[in-house]
Amino acid sequence: MWVDAIRPHVGGLAAASALSGAANLLFRSFPNSRKVVEGVPLYLFFVAMLFQLFVYPHFAWSAWKFTGYDDGWFSQGWGADPMGAAKQHERVWLYAMFGFMMKDMWIFRNDLLFFLHHGIAMAGVLTFFTVPAGLGQFLVGGTVLEMGNLTYNIVLLKGKDSGPNVSPTVKHLAEVLYAIGMGVSNYVGARMFATFTKYDGLKGTYWPWGLGLMWFALIAGRSHVHLSRSWPYFAQRWGGKGKGKAKGKGKSNVRDNAPATVAEVRVTRSAKSRR
């Protein structure tokens, strides 16, 4: 049944993976796009932020708009015609998420953590082609989490560890944006999943348990990264116990030790030579 439900989407998943890979190649061709920031080539930041700013919000909003902004959309499943026009935006959102995960698998083939994280995330996306309810809630919840990832990309580019060409004011604002944005993203994402589990067709089934394990493991990892960076930064600024921890020389080691987050661009030092 699961395989039968996914089979009609194979073409869309393949096309999204190809287009996502093409986006990598396009942005990689720009001047200075291979410059490494926090161990990550700039072009991967650009592609990630493109998806987070435009792709996911656009298709989630368009899917809801197609229903006339019907609140019932959040609790609906695929219905009788999952390949019909009524679910076109939901399909593309999932295709885009899968393609985004897939595009870097070969690049980071030697990074076990990356493979585990992205492999689980892609399996989760495929699972949602069979979800009996709450499809809209998942799309919006996933978009909310991606907006948190957007603030993470911004803080890596313009935060406390960025170069001397970035002003102290901009660095601080980036840290504030991340501290607030990621915290709100995690909280809203957790609340939305709690609502998701109460929908008819999900309540009392195995769905909330399986998906909840992945969802809250993800939020726990994101929260660890979030607090590992923001807590010492603001404690140091306010003269607390974290004094001296946030203001180091060179790159922060938080990213290297942090769990990967959903759709997060993660690059190991060993991957640099392949660029």
Question: What residues fall within each predicted segment?
Answer:
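Functional transmembrane alpha-helices
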Residues: 143-144, 148-153
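Membrane-helix and juxtamembrane interface regions of eukaryotic multi-pass membrane proteins
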Residues: 1-144, 158-244, 253-257, 274-275
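Arg/Lys-rich low-complexity patches in intrinsically disordered regions that function as generic
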Residues: 266-274
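Short hydrophobic transmembrane-like helices used for membrane targeting/insertion
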Residues: 254, 262-267
